Regions:
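Short catalytic/ligand-binding loop motif for oxyanion handling, primarily in non-cytosolic enzymes
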Residues: 80-82, 172-175
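Short, well-ordered amphipathic alpha-helices
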Residues: 8, 86-88, 182-191
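Radical SAM [4Fe-4S] cluster-binding motif and immediate context
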Residues: 2-162
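Glycine-rich phosphate-binding active-site loops on the catalytic face of alpha/beta enzymes
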Residues: 194
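Ligand/cofactor pocket segment of small-molecule handling proteins
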Residues: 169
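Short acidic/histidine-rich active-site segments
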Residues: 166
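Catalytic cores of alpha/beta
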Residues: 112-114, 173-187
């Protein structure tokens, strides 16, 4: 682009944007080894967790330094039990933070846990759905059960936390019917969430 007066005038303004959203890690890598994922192999596969008290301390310091109350957890997966521990820290402190992160479906996530997480300021959870077919999930080595998916999404939405689902079509041996089943499920979740 040539340096013209018009080009210089195109400097964006961010003054009307909401407050700063800062990235935070609570862990590195992922503890699972899904068949399709390159993260464990590309990064050495060593899952490391930071103590939740330290994560909360970092959030408080970022809040003090930059005035932000909004955090994006950029973990490959933020374990549900660790989300609950963070919620306990935030709720006990009385601080007003807002945050979101990505986790895995789990039998330990419950209505009570999602309510606690919502109360702490969580305003979105991203889940790696990948497929809504147990056979395909098993081939993917997701270590996930379809009944966990149903329960977690239902409880999360009922707590007031929107969900963002990642899914894929065309995993080796996946049938057309299985792919269409996953698409239908995601459409049902979308309709339920409205």
């Amino acid at each position: 682009i040539s340096d013209t007066g018009a080009a210089r005038a195109l400097t964006p303004t961010f003054s009307t944007l909401p407050e700063l959203i800062l990235p935070v890690y609570s862990s590195r890598q992922c503890f699972n080894h899904c068949a399709f994922c390159t993260i464990p192999g590309a990064t050495g596969g060593c899952y490391r967790k930071m103590p939740i008290s330290r994560v909360f301390e970092i959030m408080c310091r970022l809040n003090e330094k930059y005035g932000t109350r909004v955090f994006s957890f950029v973990d490959e997966t933020f374990e549900g039990k660790r989300m609950e521990q963070l919620a306990d820290e935030i709720n006990a402190s009385g601080k007003t933070f807002f945050w979101h992160g990505e986790t895995r479906f789990s039998p330990t996530l419950s209505t009570d846990v999602f309510n606690k997480i919502y109360q702490s300021g969580c305003r979105q959870i991203q889940f790696g759905l990948e497929s809504y077919n147990q056979r395909v999930l098993d081939l993917m080595k997701k270590n996930t059960r379809v009944d966990w998916i149903d329960r977690n999404i239902h409880d999360c939405l009922n707590a007031g936390i929107p969900v963002h689902l990642f899914f894929m079509i065309g995993f080796p041996t996946e049938t057309k019917e299985e792919a269409l089943n996953t698409l239908a499920y995601t459409e049902n979740v979308l309709n339920y969430s409205k």
